[in-house]
Amino acid sequence: MIQQETRLKVADNSGAREVLTIKVLGGSGRKTANIGDVIVCTVKQATPGGVVKKGEVVKAVIVRTKSGARRSDGSYISFDENACVIIRDDKSPRGTRIFGPVARELRENNFMKIVSLAPEVI
């Protein structure tokens, strides 16, 4: 589960390497987010020459979490790290590549472009 002040790795080539969560979107007073939820972040580390600069406020969707997500068949899925993909307002990714696996829950939340770019969907 991701909450305010959580740092996440960025799993795309938008230029950001690490972001800090500012707000969890979706309802007033919502405290935590899980895989497939949209968050507002600020960029803490960025690569030189990238599309996204350090200090920029961006929206991102969570693609991997250490604390697992429960699926409808009763199984749980968890990853080794917390990671997100930076998105535009129309839910399309700002980068052109996705690194590492992403969860199948993104397909249910209509992030089809991220699912199609990902090397592996778990």
From Swiss-Prot:
It comes from Bacillus subtilis (strain 168). Binds to 23S rRNA. Forms part of two intersubunit bridges in the 70S ribosome. Belongs to the universal ribosomal protein uL14 family. This is Large ribosomal subunit protein uL14. CDD domains: Ribosomal_uL14. GO terms for biological process: translation. SMART domains: Ribosomal_L14 (SM01374). One of its GO terms (molecular function) is structural constituent of ribosome. One of its GO terms (cellular component) is cytosolic large ribosomal subunit. The gene is rplN. It holds the Pfam family Ribosomal_L14. Keywords: Ribonucleoprotein, Ribosomal protein, RNA-binding, rRNA-binding. The lineage of its organism: Bacteria, Bacillati, Bacillota, Bacilli, Bacillales. Part of the 50S ribosomal subunit. Forms a cluster with proteins L3 and L19. In the 70S ribosome, L14 and L19 interact and together make contacts with the 16S rRNA in bridges B5 and B8.
